[in-house]
Amino acid sequence: MFKIREKTNADHKVKYIVDVNEKNWNEAYQKKLNAAVKNVKIQGFRKGHVPYQEAIKHIDQIGLFDRAVNQLVQPIYLELVKQEKIKDSETVLEENPEVSVVEIDDKKLALSYSFETIPEVKVGDYLKINGFLSETPVKDEDVQTELVRIFKSAGKLVDKKEGATLEKGDIAFLDFSGEIDNKAFEGGKAKNYELEIGSNSFIPGFEDQMVGMKVGEKRDLNLTFPKDYHEKTYAGKPVLFKVKLNSIKEVQLPEMTVEKLNELMKTQYKNLDEAKEDIKKRMDRNQQEHANQMNTMLLTQFANEDCQFSHIPKSLLDREVNLLYQQFANQMQQIKMSVEDALKIQNQTKEQLYQRLTEQATRAIKLVLVLEEIGDLEKISVSEAEINQEIEERIKEISNNQELPKEQYDAIKNYFVTQKELIESMLTNKKVVDLIIKKNLAR
């Protein structure tokens, strides 16, 4: 079908110039020419009956070449990838090569295929990353606390008995006024403000220093605004709060029955034990998702700040940006809003959106490249059995653990088999992440 005339490797690209076999080019050209001739319209002739030599005078030659070339681009690409073993290459990306015409006329065709190279990655010390979260099992007391929180939403506020002191979990009604450098500041004063002690609604130390107060008592709280406080004017500054406790209330819980719980949660539990088991699973899942999110953020930061890359392939970047844009468009569609309207509300242009998505895509690609490099360094691999197990797990999720008819099961499995490379990559990266976290937590 073709012969490689030249192969070069420069500027992070491997470029092939191929001379297309004259017979293949002639067949493609003649096929498109004959189709074009049939569609030529000239006054005095019926469509499809214009004399051949007269018809070709009225054909757009550039458009004809373009259609004929397009017929050959994909078959030549597939054969080139196979012949040069690009699919198995550890240095060349097979996806989306740049294709251009080098030479063309009705007798010959030469094409250029330019493949991007896989970036060289210099990984930082991935065994000295601080801040990873481990998956801590949810305890029975955690479940009980969550259960109380749910019932608390239907509770009543009642006055605490006379002479009682303020404790964590109580609701305080207080007057307060704050001073920075002996001067009042905006937002630093309120009357009969409702505050749950232990909710950490105020700056660190405020609620802790109120514990033990009695109704009518006044107290000065010497505190410091956090350095990362959202109001930069106050960040890191000492502050004095003068507080007076007006009343102490506590939440009187309703009777903790399964009937009341079902009413509050809109569920159909048979008993509280079943509810606790389900709540525990949900809390475990939420905790795992939170840990995964935080750990991914740490790894992304490491990949972008402590690792070096020779380049970021445009083909990968374009694909990731398009994927992120589609996700954004789908999210807007779910709330019945167009991308254009969303951008107006955010006071953003489409160019600014693409710039943001490009930055986001770059960070994500760098993380994947780093995980792949660490996977190679640590010689991490995934077995065929692990891939098949993952496929079976995904089928179970889709079927909700129900047995599927054989025809439906086979169709779903065949789809996942076509995604084996993607599944293998996902499982490998998960192993890499687990290894990094495990080794860092063990330090």
Curated annotation (Swiss-Prot):
Species assigned in the record: Mycoplasmoides gallisepticum (strain R(low / passage 15 / clone 2)) (Mycoplasma gallisepticum)
Coiled coil segments of this chain: none
Disulphide bridges: none
The protein's name in its UniProt record: Trigger factor
EC number of the protein: 5.2.1.8
Catalytic activity from the UniProt record: [protein]-peptidylproline (omega=180) = [protein]-peptidylproline (omega=0)
NCBIfam families registered for this protein in UniProt: tig
PANTHER family for the chain: TRIGGER FACTOR CHAPERONE AND PEPTIDYL-PROLYL CIS/TRANS ISOMERASE (PTHR30560), TRIGGER FACTOR-LIKE PROTEIN TIG, CHLOROPLASTIC (PTHR30560:SF3)
Annotated localization: Cytoplasm
Gene3D superfamilies named among the record's database cross-references: 3.10.50.40, Trigger factor ribosome-binding domain, Trigger factor, C-terminal domain
tRNA processing among keywords: no
Domain PPIase FKBP-type as annotated: residue spans: 169-254
GO MF term (any one): protein folding chaperone
Function of the protein: Involved in protein export. Acts as a chaperone by maintaining the newly synthesized protein in an open conformation. Functions as a peptidyl-prolyl cis-trans isomerase.
Tagged with keyword Transferase: no
HAMAP family in UniProt: Trigger_factor_Tig
One annotated GO biological process: protein unfolding
Annotated Pfam families: FKBP_C (PF00254), Trigger_C (PF05698), Trigger_N (PF05697)
Top-level class of the enzyme under EC nomenclature: isomerase
Chief location bin: cytoplasm
Entry remark concerning the domains of this protein: Consists of 3 domains; the N-terminus binds the ribosome, the middle domain has PPIase activity, while the C-terminus has intrinsic chaperone activity on its own.
Keywords, comma-separated and alphabetical: Cell cycle, Cell division, Chaperone, Cytoplasm, Isomerase, Rotamase
